[in-house]
Amino acid sequence: MNLEKLEVSHDADSLCVVIEISKHSNIKYELDKESGALMVDRVLYGAQNYPANYGFVPNTLGSDGDPVDALVLSDVAFQAGSVVKARLVGVLNMEDESGMDEKLIALPIDKIDPTHSYVKDIDDLSKHTLDKIKHFFETYKDLEPNKWVKVKGFENKESAIKVLEKAIKAYQG
């Protein structure tokens, strides 16, 4: 995949997210920046699966030095390597052994999947959905040597937009 040729939207209501890991997968993939190939990073050490589609927003730079991460919540699993237009509803703030690591929380635009069209902000998601996401990230590195995660909590769409804007500016230098 050549991200340079991808028409990237940074509109909070129609954001391009490259899916690296499909919902329910237990394999962590990462896009190789040089080749554009989707590389297997590792199989999760614990008996867990990703609770949502997981990827990144192209042409951004998060506080961890990589493109900013994004979870795309949907009842379906999107193919790894696909690009989904999504709308921001919040952000998960966490810290791991490498430092701060924000995860944007998004839903597919209604044209792609109208199932959750009523969700406009993080507080519109069920407590159970947020608890599953939080639990996954609190525990998915538990069995890996020298790795840890501390989930700081969820913030609203306004905070997510600030994280996105900061990541765009960091990418642009």
Swiss-Prot record:
Binding site for Mg(2+) 1: 64, 69, 101
Reactions catalysed: diphosphate + H2O = 2 phosphate + H(+)
UniProt binding sites for substrate: 28, 42, 54, 140
Ligand binding (Mg(2+) 2): 69
GO MF annotation list: inorganic diphosphate phosphatase activity; magnesium ion binding
Gene Ontology cellular-component annotations: cytosol
Location, primary (coarse class): cytoplasm
Cellular location(s): Cytoplasm
GO-annotated biological processes: phosphate-containing compound metabolic process
InterPro entries per record: Pyrophosphatase (IPR008162), Pyrophosphatase_sf (IPR036649)
Cofactors: Mg(2+)
Keyword terms, alphabetized: Cytoplasm, Hydrolase, Magnesium, Metal-binding
EC number: 3.6.1.1
Family: Belongs to the PPase family.
Job of this protein: Catalyzes the hydrolysis of inorganic pyrophosphate (PPi) forming two phosphate ions.
Assembly behavior: Homohexamer.
Name of this chain's protein: Inorganic pyrophosphatase
Lineage: Bacteria, Pseudomonadati, Campylobacterota, Epsilonproteobacteria, Campylobacterales
